[in-house]
Design a protein with these regions (language model features):
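Catalytic Walker B motif of ABC-type/P-loop ATPase nucleotide-binding domains
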Residues: 55-58
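Helix N-cap at the start of a conserved alpha-helix in ABC-type nucleotide-binding domains
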Residues: 66-68
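C-terminal boundary and immediately downstream tail of ABC-type ATPase nucleotide-binding domains
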Residues: 122-157
Length: 166
């Protein structure tokens, strides 16, 4: 499709998608002049230039700081909606999962272990998923506080008084 376009049409479309990812003047720079986050946004622009039906993102936030990661997550979510495309994200970043994921599948050793949405994941009883999500004590406490808020009890044999008095 794109190969049949005349140069001015191609340039116009490239500039449109660069503008959409907030990189209006990136086409005037060398790749070495772009930050990691800018390179990720260029990658997203390249992926959407032909109006695809699917967007595949493999670890879209690898190597990025937390603020830039959040920006990339929001951009992926916005583009998914604006372009009415199905986006598939492969990631180990639970922040991205929670930010982007409408429908989440957790896999372990190539097998589906859990399926649901980003609201249900907090209440999952799948031990392997919980080990992955709530690896730190802080996150375990956050989950227990969430469970306490919604159900009046915590999810395991942890001491509720200790949790509340931390």
């Amino acid at each position: 499709m794109f190969t049949d376009w005349k140069y001015p049409e191609k340039l116009k479309r490239v500039n449109e998608v660069l503008d959409r990812v907030n990189l209006k003047d990136a086409n005037k720079k060398f790749p070495s002049e772009l930050s990691g986050g800018m390179k990720k946004r260029v990658g997203i622009a390249r992926a959407i230039v032909l109006n695809p039906k699917f967007l595949f993102c493999d670890e879209p936030n690898s190597g990025l700081d937390p603020q830039t990661s959040l920006l990339i997550d929001k951009l992926i979510k916005e583009i998914t909606i604006e372009y009415n495309i199905t986006t598939i994200v492969n990631t180990h970043d639970m922040n991205s999962v929670m930010e982007i994921g409408d429908h989440i599948i957790y896999m372990y050793e190539g097998k589906k272990q859990w399926e649901g949405n980003n609201k249900e994941i907090i209440f999952s009883k799948n031990d392997r998923l919980n080990e992955f999500i709530f690896a730190s004590e802080f996150l375990k406490d956050a989950k227990d506080m969430r469970m306490l808020e919604h159900t009046g009890k915590i999810s395991n044999d942890r001491d509720m008084d200790e949790l509340l008095n931390k």
